[in-house]
Curated annotation (Swiss-Prot):
It is found in: Host cytoplasm; Virion. Belongs to the peptidase C63 family. Disulfide bonds: none annotated. Keywords: Host cytoplasm, Host-virus interaction, Hydrolase, Inhibition of host innate immune response by virus, Late protein, Protease, Thiol protease, Viral immunoevasion, Virion. It comes from African swine fever virus (isolate Warthog/Namibia/Wart80/1980). Induction: Expressed in the late phase of the viral replicative cycle. Pfam families: Peptidase_C48. This is SUMO-1 cysteine protease S273R. Cysteine protease that plays several role during infection including processing of the structural polyprotein or inhibition of the host immune response. Catalyzes the maturation of the pp220 and pp62 polyprotein precursors into core-shell proteins. Plays a role in the disruption of host pyroptosis via specific cleavage of gasdermin D/GSDMD. In addition, strongly decreases the host cGAS-STING signaling by targeting IKBKE via its enzymatic activity. Also impairs host FOXJ1-mediated antiviral effect via degradation of FOXJ1. It comes from the Viruses.
Length: 273
């Protein structure tokens, strides 16, 4: 079985919380843009996202008072390097996690962080995990700030400092489901967590031990999965997505997941245009 078959995502460009994937668009927008959608080839398009981002369609929508930006944000996957090996930006990552937080209603999507989070203002270092669990921590979902109880937490960190341009993406996942809770660090290159992450994990562990009897920290780093120079972002997102879909962390320490798997996973992450 392919590793991608273990998760619930698909190559459709529609946001995953939509049940009808025949069209990503709302019925109102479909109706208003029927003529454009029927002749999308003449626009040089092969997807709905291409159609609604086309200058002619955007101009028409503006005249009609149609909010296409909301359609893109809530009914399509995030933009990003779907069909190439371009490096993922923090926008690609955060916008993907925001969309997953719509599908997974008990998932807390934390904005990205650089590795100097202990001295620079990042949400990651300010989160109280007990408040996350109880629904007292603010998070951004569907274009608005909300509070809701969450039993999973995910964040993608960069190993560079905020003064740099970025080096390597890694993942943090906190699982507050079941009897034994876990605070997990995943690095596709197989490197151990650096000091700031170790301290963060231990601090969060002490927070959670106040409300739950068993909490462990895990470094999921015993296998060097990544061999390329480009796939750390997809690997980090894949770890979070797999864990949300109840794939055990043990899967990542028992067999290598290939770069080729991540090339395919990109088509699950991003919309076509």
């Amino acid at each position: 079985m392919s590793i991608l078959e273990k998760i619930t995502s698909s190559p459709s460009e529609c946001a995953e919380h939509l049940t009808n994937k025949d069209s990503c668009l709302s019925k109102k927008i479909q109706k208003e843009l029927t003529s454009f959608l029927q002749k999308k080839e003449t626009l040089g398009c092969d997807s709905e996202s291409c159609v609604i981002t086309h200058p002619a369609v955007k101009a028409y929508a503006q005249q009609k008072g149609l909010d296409l930006s909301k359609e893109l944000e809530t009914r399509f996957k995030a933009p990003g390097p779907r069909n190439n090996t371009g490096l993922l930006t923090n926008f690609n990552i955060d916008e993907t996690l925001q969309r997953w937080a719509i599908k997974y209603t008990k998932f807390f999507n934390c904005p990205f962080s650089m590795m100097d989070f202990e001295r620079v203002h990042y949400k990651f270092n300010q989160v109280d995990m007990v408040k996350v669990y109880k629904g007292e921590e603010l998070q951004y979902v569907e274009g608005k700030v909300v509070k809701r109880p969450c039993n999973t937490f995910g964040c993608v960190l960069n190993t560079d400092f905020s003064t740099g341009t970025g080096k390597h993406w890694v993942a943090i996942f906190v699982d507050m489901r079941g009897d034994c809770w876990s605070i997990e660090y995943f690095n596709s290159a197989g490197n151990s967590p650096p000091g700031p992450v170790i301290r963060w994990m231990e601090r969060v562990k002490q927070q959670l031990l106040k409300i739950h009897h068993t909490v462990k920290t895990l470094a999921v780093t015993n296998i060097r999965h990544q061999r390329s120079q480009t796939e750390c972002g997809p690997y980090s997102l894949f770890y979070i997505r797999a864990r949300l879909d109840n794939v055990s962390y043990a899967h990542f320490i028992s067999a290598r997941i290939t770069d080729e798997d991540m090339y395919k996973f990109r088509t699950h992450l991003f919309r076509i245009a």
